[in-house]
């Protein structure tokens, strides 16, 4: 089983890339994890944001691993505790399917992407920059894998 974070947006600043790389490295022996950055759709004066979201959605769908279990990060999604995420990860391991976690653009996911999602999650009620969400997802996946391995990283 492998996991892929598909994130729509600009290239991450160095502090995000460094943090993500650290968790990616830590996670690698439990769960191979990669980041795929999706170019954002064109926005601005005279441009239709729905068209930008549709364009992003096409690129996201093209980046999905075949037969992956898809989790879309979305404001109205379900919130999970770290312990619940560990339980989900254990369940997914039993299924053997690859995982895809999706971070949408400024207007969220296209209807086509939303329809493909097996689950929708929310990081929480706070509004976070999408770049920071990349780090949160990577850290929480590492925490969940560490919990399943009885590693002392999670001491709750």
Swiss-Prot record:
It comes from the Bacteria. The keyword rRNA processing applies. The keyword Cytoplasm applies. It is an enzyme of class 2 (transferase). Disulfide bonds: none annotated. Its EC number is 2.1.1.177. Keywords: Cytoplasm, Methyltransferase, rRNA processing, S-adenosyl-L-methionine, Transferase. Pfam families: SPOUT_MTase. InterPro entries: Alpha/beta_knot_MTases, RlmH-like, tRNA_m1G_MTases_N. GO terms for cellular component: cytoplasm. It catalyses: pseudouridine(1915) in 23S rRNA + S-adenosyl-L-methionine = N(3)-methylpseudouridine(1915) in 23S rRNA + S-adenosyl-L-homocysteine + H(+). S-adenosyl-L-methionine binds at residues 73, 104, 123-128. It is found in: Cytoplasm. HAMAP family: 23SrRNA_methyltr_H. Specifically methylates the pseudouridine at position 1915 (m3Psi1915) in 23S rRNA. Homodimer. This is Ribosomal RNA large subunit methyltransferase H.
